[in-house]
Amino acid sequence: MSTIFALCTPWGKSGVAVIRVSGQDAVKTFMHFKISNAIKPRVATFTPLYNAAHEVIDEVIVVYFSAPNSFTGEDVVELHTHGSIAVIRMILCELGKIFIPAGPGEFSLRAFLNNKVDLTRAEAIVDLINAETEMQAKQAIRQMSGSLEKLYQSWRQQLIDVLSNMEAYIDFPEEVTSFAVENISFLLDKIKESLENHLNDGRKGEILRQGIYVAILGEPNSGKSTLFNHLAKRDIAIVSEYAGTTRDVLETHIDIAGYPIVIIDTAGIRDSNDPVEQEGIRRAKLKAESADFKIIMLPYEKKDALNNEIIDLIDDRSICVLSKSDSIITQNLININDINFIPVSVCCNLGIEHLLSAIQKKVEADFKFCSTSPFITSDRQRVHIQNAVNILKNISFELPMELISEDLRLSVRELEKVVGVISNEEILDNVFGKFCIGK
């Protein structure tokens, strides 16, 4: 394979920039920049870099990783330079004379091709890079440690063990007894049950990776946009005394106790003849159905006249808020018609911590086990595992052993696609195309 190079750190002014070179000719970097110092593997070496005119480009730290003991499994040279745009540009220009610029995710792709990481670990790398909260990072790190790979490889090996027994029975049909068939059926049912339990996870891993959606719902002028802006810590939604100001769905990302929360502002729900407002209300109701959790807003002045359409939205995913509670001193829940409301006044900054704590408790009750157990984190993984289950479900022991064996092979292949034992160009493009250049 050709030798590639790229800037690994973000482009722009910084204290330090890191430029990575990987490939069989990576050590030519030393000769090209006229590095006279003896560079030893895994030792940081301070040295000047020279251009063709023997002018100093920069004084850098060089780190050399010899194959196969590197991230990519190839010879790797890292140049730790000053983060000057001019210096970075000059070094990249020099490297471009002898090497090929790396594409997005190409270093990680080479790590995969050289058996340094499987596909689940490769996906975890990009998830860690994109993580914005502690829980997202923890999930990615756990996956990078191989928790998913070990789980899928375990199921794969169990299927291979069953397949081996099947092949033996095909070669020695006289050994096939009703007990042997029952034992194989029992083992396959156990594997299938484990796979189905893994699939029936409420998509918790994917939700944690993408963000937990919390929709703010209520009548017009119930303080939804005011609360939304307060949680976002900036003015995103237009706040007005006129009812029906919010028409479209707005989103902002916040961090609550390390969990990635996407707060959604919606149009006020009421009867309206305005077609534009009607569309906003329709979208609000859709968000009420699809959101992971809901904040139901009721203005304090309307506590004695509950809107049935709003009350009907309340379920076990809901947190009820009595908004505009400026005159209420208590921090305790207020019970109205057997519904507990958190009194909140945004303008007086009252009840906000109570609300955030309530959101945290709801989220932790649903997602805390994500911090200890390996969960599916991508649609790609889910599709292949579901395919494996479907194949196992369709196995009939009334068919010849040869056909059952073929179905088992297909199921094994689906699990192999998850970790990348079997891969094709489309799968690799889908996984590694999400990476930035330099990773």
Curated annotation (Swiss-Prot):
EC number(s) of the enzyme?
3.6.-.-
Where does it live in the cell?
Cytoplasm
One Gene Ontology BP term is:
tRNA wobble uridine modification
Q: Which GO terms describe its cellular component?
A: cytoplasm
Positions binding (6S)-5-formyl-5,6,7,8-tetrahydrofolate in this chain are 20, 78, 116, 439
User: Do the record's keywords include Cell wall biogenesis/degradation?
Assistant: no
Q: Which residues bind Mg(2+)?
A: 225, 246
Q: Which GO terms describe its molecular function?
A: GTP binding; GTPase activity; metal ion binding
- Cofactor, how bound (note): Binds 1 potassium ion per subunit.
What cofactor does this chain's UniProt record say it requires?
A: K(+)
InterPro entries per UniProt: G_TrmE, GTP-bd, GTP-bd_TrmE_N, GTPase_MnmE, MnmE_dom2, MnmE_helical, P-loop_NTPase, Small_GTP-bd
Q: State whether it acts alone or in a complex, and with which partners, per the record.
A: Homodimer. Heterotetramer of two MnmE and two MnmG subunits.
The protein's name: tRNA modification GTPase MnmE
- Native species: Ehrlichia ruminantium (strain Gardel)
